[in-house]
Amino acid sequence: MNQEVKNKIFSILKITFATALFIFVVITLYRELSGINFKDTLVEFSKINRMSLVLLFIGGGASLVILSMYDVILSRALKMDISLGKVLRVSYIINALNAIVGFGGFIGAGVRAMVYKNYTHDKKKLVHFISLILISMLTGLSLLSLLIVFHVFDASLILDKITWVRWVLYVVSFFLPLFIIYSMVRPPDKNNRFVGLYCTLVSCVEWLAAAVVLYFCGVIVDAHVSFMSFIAIFIIAALSGLVSFIPGGFGAFDLVVLLGFKTLGVPEEKVLLMLLLYRFAYYFVPVIIALILSSFEFGTSAKKYIEGSKYFIPAKDVTSFLMSYQKDIIAKIPSLSLAILVFFTSMIFFVNNLTIVYDALYDGNHLTYYILLAIHTSACLLLLLNVVGIYKQSRRAIIFAMISILLITVATFFTYASYILITWLAIIFVLLIVAFRRARRLKRPVRMRNIVAMLLFSLFILYVNHIFIAGTLYALDIYTIEMHTSVLRYYFWLTILIIAIIIGMIAWLFDYQFSKVRISSKIEDCEEIINQYGGNYLSHLIYSGDKQFFTNENKTAFLMYRYKASSLVVLGDPLGDENAFDELLEAFYNYAEYLGYDVIFYQVTDQHMPLYHNFGNQFFKLGEEAIIDLTQFSTSGKKRRGFRATLNKFDELNISFEIIEPPFSTEFINELQHVSDLWLDNRQEMHFSVGQFNEEYLSKAPIGVMRNEENEVIAFCSLMPTYFNDAISVDLIRWLPELDLPLMDGLYLHMLLWSKEQGYTKFNMGMATLSNVGQLHYSYLRERLAGRVFEHFNGLYRFQGLRRYKSKYNPNWEPRFLVYRKDNSLWESLSKVMRVIRHK
């Protein structure tokens, strides 16, 4: 049997044992708890002195400082260049995390390796020392177990109840001398032979400190037993929790304590309350302190230190590849810690709704209570809704949280005023102020699906809150009180109203205040860039007057865009120096992220797809643009006799064509205005991706006109210079609708011939929307659906007719795409683009 098979068998046996033990613990614990009167437990809790609780929580938080001695020993043994204060802070955070999700201490060992590897040259020795610390966590318990084996502590009652623990006790006791001998014979560092002994002493003191915390919990709930009997129960319970491999020993530890105190005649209700207080004081309080420390300890300074550390080695294999993300993970720890704290705060104060309801039922002034209850619940829900925003470092989410904290403080002050809770709210408020100053964005993008999800989640939470309050009142036999006049009558709807008012006010203030933040470069900068680097088929639309511009720092490239509904809709590809496009887009995305906007690109080519992909985008094919090769275009030949017939017909009717160069006279503009108004027929002009009839815009390029015998303008088209590849395009094409003549054909033919004479080689006839989209069954569903629209909705919008019309000029079809964030909705993105196009 090779080593690999042995390891697999050992792993299977270990998992099987842990699972079987867990099932046994759950079943036994359920049987023990089923007979407990929870109402009596709540009554016992109400009798506890609040100052005793404060002392308990302080003691629970302070007890974990002892574990920091591990890291002090480690840093001194390896001669790390790290201050004692930093060691204590980092160690406290690691140990608090390890206590909750320790898995036998392996989580803590992994975090230690990640943090301290940047402070030492000898990584191998660091791993050896951390392994020694990991094992020594058991040796302290082993030392205490020896005291039971030699009958210093009497554990006969509990050992008779749980016989299998006796064997665990003997094995663990025997482990101590082996560890001490091994650590002294083969130490990680020959100059530190007694490190194993030091760590064992730290471990022993730490277990005793935990025992003192639990004993104090027993004193608080009036569960008096002798300390010698108690310590024996605690040691066996700790061993059971350690063997179970369950984080924190949850279940196994509690079961042994419950059975042990039961044998000593302590009521189960008191034991349960004692365990709950212990879990809160020894686990929850240190985690809260660790989260607060994390919000200060692991910030931008830590990230900069790691990036500049001479010990930081680039990733070369799988392990180092994962570790290469550590600086990003560490940078997110403060916001993650604060988000968790806000989440816990929300949950705790949701539970405190019950206190307000309980007091209100016995008070004649129901109105005041039910308004305060609605405010309290609204604030708790707002805290919960903004947890993700706080993690994402959104200033708007932090402001929501700060307002919620203030509202909860007011409600707390006027109802169940508690100095502990108000102090806690003050701490969270200060942390939110610090987070607000560090925040890297004003707000997150507002998306329809997020709004719907938020509404559904809010309704669910409010419903659960109602069920919790009603169920608790029923369990406490309070439902006999008449409820029709109580605070619960209009509570739900008032809560929704308060939430809507707060969200509406803050959202409006942010949009109003920061709508002025949007920056726009000067059009002169864009003109200079186009003159130097060239343009594209859309570059002339910088003169349309409905766009803003974003340039890079060196002003060698720019984008033209427009804001709509928390999105920046960009028209076409970037313009300018292609080498600057990466820098330009990165700056633009940073700008959009800071303001909380989505970025959407409309009508881009396939030339820069890799660039857009690098920014986490996906694509949707909008259609194809018809580009005519003027070097191959001609009206001669059998296939072109239709073109010649059209031109001959206009000649017979004495309809002429000419190109008018700017500046234009007022009379000429008025003639064009007359044709444009009749052609529009009171329809609204489109914007953004096309030009509009505007004298300033039209005066930027020549205009082709067709005149009748009376020299009156009957049709016109505006030119769009592209400033690249000898190409030209047309924008507005309008004619008198009452004339039964192929005026659009006439304009196109004359423009094509004129452009060819002027030396242009390409002519852009515009896009055929949804053309050649989703034609294969391998295409995305959204594109296949768009393709069906192209085929079957020709009566609603002439998709096919437009392509057929342009196809007779034998163009080359070039695809055009919509580019949008991968976590955004296609239909929402298309909707925003259409709103930009159809509204000025």
Curated annotation (Swiss-Prot):
It is a multi-pass membrane protein. InterPro entries: Acyl_CoA_acyltransferase, L-PG_synthase/AglD, LPG_synthase_C, PG_lysyltransferase. The chain crosses the membrane at residues 9-29, 53-73, 90-110, 129-149, 162-182, 201-221, 230-250, 272-292, 338-358, 370-390, 395-415, 416-436, 451-471, 490-510. Residues 1-8, 74-89, 150-161, 222-229, 293-337, 391-394, 437-450, 511-840 are cytoplasmic. One of its GO terms (cellular component) is plasma membrane. GO terms for molecular function: phosphatidylglycerol lysyltransferase activity. Pfam families: LPG_synthase_C, LPG_synthase_TM. Its EC number is 2.3.2.3. Keywords: Antibiotic resistance, Cell membrane, Lipid metabolism, Membrane, Transferase, Transmembrane, Transmembrane helix, Virulence. It is an enzyme of class 2 (transferase). Residues 30-52, 111-128, 183-200, 251-271, 359-369, 472-489 are extracellular. It is found in: Cell membrane. One of its GO terms (biological process) is response to antibiotic. It catalyses: L-lysyl-tRNA(Lys) + a 1,2-diacyl-sn-glycero-3-phospho-(1'-sn-glycerol) = a 1,2-diacyl-sn-glycero-3-phospho-1'-(3'-O-L-lysyl)-sn-glycerol + tRNA(Lys). Catalyzes the transfer of a lysyl group from L-lysyl-tRNA(Lys) to membrane-bound phosphatidylglycerol (PG), which produces lysylphosphatidylglycerol (LPG), a major component of the bacterial membrane with a positive net charge. LPG synthesis contributes to bacterial virulence as it is involved in the resistance mechanism against cationic antimicrobial peptides (CAMP) produces by the host's immune system (defensins, cathelicidins) and by the competing microorganisms (bacteriocins). Belongs to the LPG synthase family. This is Phosphatidylglycerol lysyltransferase. It comes from Staphylococcus aureus (strain MSSA476). The lineage of its organism: Bacteria, Bacillati, Bacillota, Bacilli, Bacillales. The gene is mprF.
